[in-house]
């Protein structure tokens, strides 16, 4: 076996029947990120990427949804001795002095149990790295995981692995949706809309220009996941007083009217509502959903059922410092249904500014410059 390292993509359980779409998205994201590759193909339940630069390619691929885990690994034939030998070599090179290690093997075994490989490889590493004080750990207590996955014909001994984004592949629903980003909750909802496989059109609603920097930074964490070289963003100025729960609810319902207008204009079937029963009253949610149905669109609520995991999503789009603000938003306590402001909706629609962003390292500055 040569010393070639591959990128190995592990689809989520929800994506295993959508692997062709995930392969398409992998090829697209590598081209967008200017990462050269020789092939992207399926091997059993995993996807094997032969890339010129596995490190940068794995980082690009891990922007995608539909992935449980991504690894850089060495390929070896699914043969007991060859797999044990490769784990011993790779694992030995990865270990530092005094580290506890855990050998974990999963997948399809032929003529042996995966546990047999784990035991044999662990024994070999202890013997060969005795001078380093390397010792086996347990499932609950280890410093380094030495992970290997077996397909029918091959074994993949991981040098590095990282957690994926979860969800299902972008565009796998074959439906389009409109979502709006106007604060932290709505940004997470937009992130979840894409994560649930919808082809998403994003609009940004702001009350004053001072909000734009923060909103654009959030957008910058979201748009690379749309698997497009260029993304069209639309900005609307919604001039509604920011103070108090009542005004916030008027603001949210006014944005709903803007989304409904844009959904009709662009023939978009689904409207993504940044609402959760954990935050908003049932009355408010029911009103919003009825408004969507009245306009012959279909509502989706990506945040429905998402509880404290919402904070993990917040960190994923760079909102660690905004978590106290999120917690404050969660304390909305009102059963009132505030109607949208027709005057402010009309003003916002007239203020619409559309810009095309070419995905790259300077997205934030490019977007803000285009809005001047």
Model feature map: region roles:
Residues 1-232, 239-245, 369-372:
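RNA-binding accessory domains that recognize and position tRNA/RNA substrates
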Residues 125, 133, 161-169, 173-174, ...:
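Active-site adenylate/phosphate-handling loop in enzymes that bind or generate adenylated species
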